Amino acid sequence: MPRSLKKGPFIDLHLLKKVEKAVESGDKKPIKTWSRRSMIIPTMIGLTIAVHNGRQHVPVFVTDEMIGHKLGEFAPTRTYRGHAADKKAKKK
């Protein structure tokens, strides 16, 4: 079930302060955050946000198509290495 429209988008206060500071100063340095649950808002467009995936910070460049999505959607937490090859099929 999606979030109610009357509540508005959720964004952590500390991240919002960092974004506003970067926008007013024109700083292009990546903003480090652990807040994967924060929603992308229009003021973030053009900024690079380094989102933590549990091991490292993944740089995410925010575009206008990303508005309304959560930051965690763009920093995958699991790595898929593929299934093991079938040894019987390899010999034939």
Curated annotation (Swiss-Prot):
Q: Which GO cellular component does the record give, naming just one?
A: cytoplasm
What InterPro entries has UniProt attached to this entry? Ribosomal_uS19 (IPR002222), Ribosomal_uS19_bac-type (IPR005732), Ribosomal_uS19_CS (IPR020934), Ribosomal_uS19_SF (IPR023575)
One GO term under biological process is: translation
Named from the GO MF annotations, one term is: structural constituent of ribosome
Keyword tags: Ribonucleoprotein, Ribosomal protein, RNA-binding, rRNA-binding
Check the record and name the Gene3D superfamilies matching this protein. Answer: 30s Ribosomal Protein S19, Chain A
Q: Which SUPFAM superfamilies match?
A: Ribosomal protein S19 (SSF54570)
Functionally, this protein is described as follows:
Protein S19 forms a complex with S13 that binds strongly to the 16S ribosomal RNA.
Q: Which family does it belong to?
A: Belongs to the universal ribosomal protein uS19 family.
Protein known as: Small ribosomal subunit protein uS19
Q: Which gene encodes it?
A: rpsS
